[in-house]
Amino acid sequence: MMEEEELEFVEELEAVLQLTPEVQLAIEQVFPSQDPLDRADFNAVEYINTLFPTEQSLANIDEVVNKIRLKIRRLDDNIRTVVRGQTNVGQDGRQALEEAQKAIQQLFGKIKDIKDKAEKSEQMVKEITRDIKQLDHAKRHLTTSITTLNHLHMLAGGVDSLEAMTRRRQYGEVANLLQGVMNVLEHFHKYMGIPQIRQLSERVKAAQTELGQQILADFEEAFPSQGTKRPGGPSNVLRDACLVANILDPRIKQEIIKKFIKQHLSEYLVLFQENQDVAWLDKIDRRYAWIKRQLVDYEEKYGRMFPREWCMAERIAVEFCHVTRAELAKIMRTRAKEIEVKLLLFAIQRTTNFEGFLAKRFSGCTLTDGTLKKLESPPPSTNPFLEDEPTPEMEELATEKGDLDQPKKPKAPDNPFHGIVSKCFEPHLYVYIESQDKNLGELIDRFVADFKAQGPPKPNTDEGGAVLPSCADLFVYYKKCMVQCSQLSTGEPMIALTTIFQKYLREYAWKILSGNLPKTTTSSGGLTISSLLKEKEGSEVAKFTLEELCLICNILSTAEYCLATTQQLEEKLKEKVDVSLIERINLTGEMDTFSTVISSSIQLLVQDLDAACDPALTAMSKMQWQNVEHVGDQSPYVTSVILHIKQNVPIIRDNLASTRKYFTQFCVKFANSFIPKFITHLFKCKPISMVGAEQLLLDTHSLKMVLLDLPSISSQVVRKAPASYTKIVVKGMTRAEMILKVVMAPHEPLVVFVDNYIKLLTDCNTETFQKILDMKGLKRSEQSSMLELLRQRLPAPPSGAESSGSLSLTAPTPEQESSRIRKLEKLIKKRL
């Protein structure tokens, strides 16, 4: 009974003392201990075993028990000491809290005393300084009153003096005095309710009005609207009057400027009236020479009369430009039928030169409030005439490099006067566009005539792949037209010129490039094997001569150059045309045309080499392969194919050296054309003996090696063939080899033969299978059962086919057949 109670007590104690892992970890960190009794996972059995590891150690059990009891007594003493120490902790805490509260109350009392003393000090300071503030206010008001009285005295005296000086036209003194009076009057805006102040303000306004009318009358007298200018330079009175006008209402200044410029240009309107001979475009230089003389005359006579900030010389020039633009537009509308392209370009050139002269002479500061910005807003940094005009030699060099731009120099700032006069020519630029249409048509006709007269370019391996000279000439002319037209306008005329460019790019592609590609001819059939194989260097089997092959390559290189340059041309046109018209610039159709020429050229080269190899393939299919008795060197038809490849490919490669990617395209297209054709002729070789199949397999491997080496054949520099091309050749020729391996395999047992076919040819089908059976010379009755077996086994997955196909060509076949294939493979390796 006692034992049960003790067990229950221990369980309750363990349940009460069960701590969470976090608490246990915290205790271990605060009170680190190496004693096993302090561990949370204490195990009494393990602890006893450590104390008494052997039976012999039990002899010391009494000593160990005494030590443990002594340790327990020490722990009990420590616990009692700690418990007694905690008896008065609560009382001590309450006492400390009461002391803290008393200290806080004392602190609040001291703070309140300090606050009361501060308020008393503030009140004392206010009482002390009350009289001083009143004195400060009095001083400030007195100062303001004195200042206002002084201003009033100055204003009254100034108004009297201003009225007197105005009557005596003493503008020099008036200019200084008026500005002072205006400044003083600003101080009295808040006193306008006082009658005397309002009266003085009205007198100032009246004096300003009188000054304005008086100055305008003086200028009208000095520079009358009707009649000629009075001799002699300007008077000092007018110079001082301009200083006064600067202070008066801005309308007075504008009226003076308007009257002076109108009087200054009155002679121009008379000299260059519409009915005068000098008014026409052919004498446009005289207009600009006249204004240049007038500007010089102005600087000499009137340069010091007007303030510098008025920019009178620039204003005269700008007004001259506006008048000239209107007069030229009117006279060109009247005499539109007399405008010729040379005359128009002459006038535009002289006008743009004059606008450039204005840009160098003046800053354009007077144009901010004018109409120029509305007239012309060219895209930034695209005016070609702000750059140095390149020489024709530089243009040709740049064009040959495929770039329409010269090495760019730092661009000059925009011309603020661009278009201020030349804008009037834009409605008549159709004359220029029509002229360029005619000139380009004649240029294309000349290219055609020159090609017929001079013939195709002479073959030259050192300059292989050079573009036709006419191409460079065309784009040089295009650049000249584009630069010239962008000088004239960046609006609709540029769109019209782009349409002309498109027209003659297509004509060049059709008449010069496509029109001069050699035509292919078909060869006659019915030739014997011996005649088909009589092919030596210089034979007529190849359809194109050396000159024709070079011509095709030149046309291809030219088309590639045109394609790249047309793309650059489109970009430059978009740079130069107005932003709102960029979307209407699109030369994609013309680039597609040149791409078509490139494709046609490559196709011609492929067809030519393909056709040259046709007789050899025909000879292959006509040979009696069942009569071949032994495997020898490569067959004559293989030698013939290799001969044609070595004749054509180096020529094409050398002439397409500058367009390597299109030579690669040629190789790929030839492989895609030749290999299927070779396999087609391979199926025609029937029936075939075992030895004949071995010979064909050897020939096929030889052709495969030649095709893999095709891109660098007969080249001193051996380059690795492109991976895409190698993949096509390996895939196609490996299929041909697999077909021959199937042909070489015995057709019995049937299951093994069919499984071999499925294994070796991944694209296996009944049609190919029947062709292979025909090559083996099997009868139709034998073929039917084999075809039926193939149909049954085709749906099987590739893995099953491979597992069943473990009966490979060598393993399940008779010993004699496997030895033949091994011999053939050794022969191929020996040749390599």
From Swiss-Prot:
The modification Phosphothreonine is found at T391. It is found in: Golgi apparatus, trans-Golgi network membrane; Endosome membrane; Recycling endosome. The keyword Phosphoprotein applies. It comes from Homo sapiens. Acts as a component of the GARP complex that is involved in retrograde transport from early and late endosomes to the trans-Golgi network (TGN). The GARP complex is required for the maintenance of the cycling of mannose 6-phosphate receptors between the TGN and endosomes, this cycling is necessary for proper lysosomal sorting of acid hydrolases such as CTSD. Acts as a component of the EARP complex that is involved in endocytic recycling. The EARP complex associates with Rab4-positive endosomes and promotes recycling of internalized transferrin receptor (TFRC) to the plasma membrane. Belongs to the VPS53 family. Residues 386-397 have a biased composition (Acidic residues). Gene3D superfamilies: Methyl-accepting chemotaxis protein, Vacuolar protein sorting-associated protein 53, C-terminus. Keywords: Acetylation, Coiled coil, Disease variant, Endosome, Epilepsy, Golgi apparatus, Intellectual disability, Membrane, Neurodegeneration, Phosphoprotein, Protein transport, Transport. GO terms for biological process: endocytic recycling; lysosomal transport; protein targeting to lysosome; retrograde transport, endosome to Golgi; vesicle-mediated cholesterol transport. The modification N6-acetyllysine is found at K110, K360. This is Vacuolar protein sorting-associated protein 53 homolog. The keyword Transport applies.
